[in-house]
């Protein structure tokens, strides 16, 4: 073990004593391997008290700014991964740094409210400015949560509560329901299920793993509910050259949804909710068409099933809209839309018909984080003030064009270029080649990441401009040539 003074010295070297960065570097700057010696030393220390198996490198957050992340060894990388798609305005945006120094945020940090019982006096105003102002069409009610997984988990609980109330003619639980549930018996503990999709990712809690099918390592050794998993479209690209094939994908997947609803009903295990991502991000950036989602909405309406759209990774503007489902033109809005990541706090919007009447059924100590809500309020203001959604559309259109050109010149190393806005991906022939590319790109100063079995994904922030795009593709081209 390092002596206490030596450990403090190492951390002090990394953190430095300078103020928070307030400008981007002129470009990437790499002086060591990544992870470098300081990152490796910090990881060794961390490993003595905490798991480190997923740690890539330690970050100097004081020196990181805008679209650039700086690691413990001083390497500056252009970041198109942005904390797994969770930084709306990049690193240390001045407007957010200013909010972080305000008394109302400090008091929420020091005396963290248990929001379900003791909310701040200005909590409703914060909800209105940060969340209601960007609410999905047709949904105004919102419930904050800690993260995307807890948002999805509690959205499903809400769906179950509503579904059972409908069975009781709109009434709450009676004495028999309350007594039997304590022994996990009917009618208080019903047989109900939630439908997910092949390739989906909705979180790693016990409940959400039952609707997650992206990577085996997430699920192995963990008990799961007997819930249906339906097929999700697997399109061929370019879309305009594969219309018939992709249309058949939609039809086959919708037929599978109908078949599994019927099958689980025969098992006395009704499908109470269907949860779906607009883009299966963790699973490999798989897309569904508006026609597919329209069909899915019509099926849920026909069967009285709650339709939950998981926008944890897609929400926040990277697709060119705050909500990726905005362009679906549904016959009626989703019943619920979950969010987190770029929207800084977790939670879900829901239709008024789903409001839970009884206290403590949707509840935990924190029920979200008011400090994140305060930051989101300012982030939304900046997004509107600076026209960042419009910028995302413009830069995103160019990004899609350039990604297609990169694929065409790759000599077969890339295929299936796809995306919406700056939310984009491209495939490699194998996962091992993709992983080799990611490591080489990082050594060249571009921080990117993988998803699915063999996909490379791009998740830049909303302050990502044409200048950053040009540099991104210079680095991608350099990396591809060195592969």
From Swiss-Prot:
Its localization reads:
Mitochondrion matrix
What domain of life?
Eukaryota
Q: Which residues bind substrate?
A: 204
Biological processes annotated in GO: gamma-aminobutyric acid catabolic process
List, alphabetically, the CDD domains matched. OAT_like
**Would I find Repeat among this entry's keywords?**
no
The UniProt entry, under InterPro entries, shows: 4NH2But_aminotransferase_euk, Aminotrans_3, Aminotrans_3_PPA_site, PyrdxlP-dep_Trfase, PyrdxlP-dep_Trfase_major, PyrdxlP-dep_Trfase_small
Which of UniProt's keywords are assigned here? Aminotransferase, Mitochondrion, Neurotransmitter degradation, Pyridoxal phosphate, Transferase, Transit peptide
Molecular functions (GO terms): (S)-3-amino-2-methylpropionate transaminase activity; 4-aminobutyrate:2-oxoglutarate transaminase activity; pyridoxal phosphate binding
Cofactors needed by this protein, per the record, are:
pyridoxal 5'-phosphate
- GO terms for CC? mitochondrial matrix; mitochondrion
What positions are modified (N6-(pyridoxal phosphate)lysine)? Answer: 341
Family stated for the protein in its record: Belongs to the class-III pyridoxal-phosphate-dependent aminotransferase family.
Stated name of the protein: Probable 4-aminobutyrate aminotransferase, mitochondrial
Natural source organism: Caenorhabditis elegans
């Amino acid at each position: 073990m390092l002596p206490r003074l030596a450990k403090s010295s190492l951390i002090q070297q990394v953190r430095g004593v300078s103020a928070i960065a307030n400008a981007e570097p002129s470009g990437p700057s790499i002086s060591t391997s990544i992870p470098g010696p300081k990152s490796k030393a910090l990881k060794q220390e961390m490993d003595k008290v905490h798991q480190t198996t997923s740690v890539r490198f330690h970050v100097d957050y004081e020196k990181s700014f805008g679209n650039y992340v700086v690691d413990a060894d001083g390497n500056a990388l252009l970041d198109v991964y942005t904390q797994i798609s969770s930084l709306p305005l990049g690193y240390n945006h001045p407007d957010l740094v200013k909010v972080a120094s305000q008394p109302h945020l400090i008091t929420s940090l020091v005396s963290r409210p248990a929001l379900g019982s003791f909310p701040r006096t200005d909590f409703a105003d914060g909800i209105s400015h940060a969340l209601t102002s960007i609410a999905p069409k047709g949904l105004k009610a919102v419930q904050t949560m800690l993260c995307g997984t807890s948002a999805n988990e509690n959205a499903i609980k809400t769906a179950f509560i509503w579904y059972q109330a409908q069975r009781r003619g709109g009434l709450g639980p009676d004495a028999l329901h309350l007594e039997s549930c304590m022994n996990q018996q009917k009618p208080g503990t019903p047989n109900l299920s939630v439908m997910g999709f092949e390739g989906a990712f909705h979180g790693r809690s016990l409940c959400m793993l039952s609707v997650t099918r992206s990577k085996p390592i997430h699920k192995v050794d963990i008990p799961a509910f007997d819930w249906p998993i339906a097929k999700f479209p697997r399109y061929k690209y370019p879309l305009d050259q594969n219309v018939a094939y992709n249309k058949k994908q939609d039809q086959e997947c919708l037929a599978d949804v109908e078949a599994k609803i019927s099958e689980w009903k025969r098992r006395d295990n009704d499908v109470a909710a269907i949860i779906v991502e607009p883009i299966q991000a963790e699973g490999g950036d798989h897309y569904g068409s508006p026609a597919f989602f329209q069909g899915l909405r019509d099926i849920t309406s026909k069967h009285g099933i709650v339709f939950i759209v998981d926008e944890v990774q897609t929400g926040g503007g990277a697709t060119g809209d705050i909500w990726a489902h905005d362009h679906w033109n549904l016959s009626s809005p989703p019943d619920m839309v979950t969010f987190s990541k770029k929207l800084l706090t977790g939670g879900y919007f829901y239709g008024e018909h789903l409001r839970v009447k009884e206290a403590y059924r949707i509840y935990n100590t924190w029920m979200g984080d008011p400090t994140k809500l305060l930051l989101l309020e300012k982030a939304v203001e900046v997004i509107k003030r600076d026209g960042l959604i419009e910028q995302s559309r413009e830069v995103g259109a160019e990004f899609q064009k350039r990604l297609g050109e990169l694929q065409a010149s790759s000599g077969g190393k890339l295929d299936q270029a796809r995306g919406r806005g700056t939310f984009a991906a491209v495939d490699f022939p194998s996962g091992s080649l993709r992983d080799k590319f990611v490591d080489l790109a990082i050594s060249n100063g571009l921080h990117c990441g993988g998803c699915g079995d063999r996909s490379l994904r791009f998740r830049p922030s909303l302050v990502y401009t044409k200048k950053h795009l040009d540099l991104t593709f210079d680095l991608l081209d350099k990396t591809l040539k060195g592969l």
